Every structure is written in structure tokens, then in C-alpha cells.
Regions:
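Membrane-embedded alpha-helical bundles that constitute the cytochrome b-like, heme-associated redox core
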Residues: 1-187
């Protein structure tokens, strides 16, 4: 089933919440890891990041195939533009965050995988195995910059998205949030 103005498909709703909740959790864990040097969380963070990338690609393909959802109501032009910008940041960000993380980790010599299944091997220094030798320092730095800046931009876009959802639900009372929870707002 494709999305309609009144109802989103189960796939759209499921992918929205799976990707949204997971990205929020990964952002929170990422901030915690950075601020607390919680090295034990890197394996989990990277593994879930790689796995969610699969769902993100599925979601992007589904969105392209299905098209953008029609608004549940009539809104001012500024609201429509802000909504489009926010949604594009979220879509691009959900692709950019896993890609930049894999680039940072892989090119930085730290490798990554899925819960012990190595996808890109670590590159330890033979003289000091605790230290990693970057495979490409420039790409690792680019990944690091994109991951950090992308994370900050994603947090802002997520907050705008959540505020918009509450505005639709509490002020406009237009069914947008109920539709994303799976309801048919045409009934």
C-alpha cells in the first residue's frame, strides 16, 4: 500500500519510527561517549550505526518510490518551506551520519563491523598494537568533521521536527501526528 493524504502505509510508519528512535539513541550515545570517554560503547554505537544504515537506505528508496507525503492540512508558505527543509535535512542526515561514521572509523584505521563481524578491519601499529594507523588521514578527518557537524545539525532538525509534530497535534489539530502513528485521519 502506498501512502495517501489520509493514511500512511505500515512500512512508512515502521521505518519512520525505527530510523527516528534509533538515530536519536545513537546521537545520545555518541554525545555520552565523547563526553565520558566511554570506549566500551563504541562497538555498540558502530554496530547499530551500520545496521540502521540498511533501514535508512530502505527508507530513502521507499520515499523516492512512494513520493513525499501530502500535508494533512493547508499551511502558510513559511511553514511548508520550513517543513521541506527540515525533512530534507533529516533524510540527508540519516544517510550522512552512518556514512561519515564508517568513513571516520574505517579510514582512521579503527575498522568497524556488526557486533564482532568485521566489515572493515582495524589497522593496528605493529610496534604499538593499542594505536591504530590511519588508512587515509584526510578521509578520516573529513568523516570526523561531517559526523560531528552532522550530529549537531541532526539534533536541531529533530527538535524542529518534534516541535512541528506537537504544533500539528495541539494547535492545528490536523491529524499529522495521528497519521504517523498509523491512524487513518480521513475517517
Amino acid at each position: 500500500m502506498l501512502d495517501t493524504k489520509e493514511k500512511f502505509s505500515h512500512l512508512t510508519v515502521s521505518l519512520h519510527w525505527l530510523v527516528g528512535v534509533t538515530i536519536i539513541a545513537l546521537l545520545a550515545v555518541g554525545i555520552y561517549m565523547e563526553e565520558n570517554e566511554a570506549d566500551a560503547l563504541y562497538l555498540i554505537h558502530k554496530s547499530i550505526g551500520v545496521l540502521i544504515f540498511i533501514a535508512v537506505l530502505w527508507r530513502v528508496i521507499w520515499r523516492v518510490r512512494n513520493g513525499w507525503p501530502k500535508p494533512a492540512g493547508n499551511y502558510k508558505k513559511v511553514e511548508r518551506v520550513l517543513s521541506k527543509i527540515t525533512h530534507w535535512i533529516l533524510i540527508i542526515g540519516t544517510v550522512l551520519m552512518p556514512v561519515s561514521g564508517m568513513l571516520m572509523s574505517g579510514a582512521g584505521g579503527h575498522g568497524f563491523g556488526i557486533f564482532g563481524l568485521e566489515l572493515v578491519a582495524m589497522n593496528p601499529d605493529p610496534l604499538n598494537p593499542e594505536e591504530m594507523i590511519p588508512l587515509n588521514q584526510s578521509l578520516a578527518e573529513l568523516g570526523h568533521i561531517l559526523h560531528g557537524a552532522g550530529g549537531n545539525l541532526m539534533i536541531l532538525a529533530i527538535l524542529l521536527h518534534i516541535l512541528g509534530a506537537f504544533k500539528h497535534h495541539l494547535v492545528d489539530k490536523d491529524g499529522t501526528l495521528r497519521r504517523m502513528l498509523g491512524a487513518d485521519i480521513g475517517r
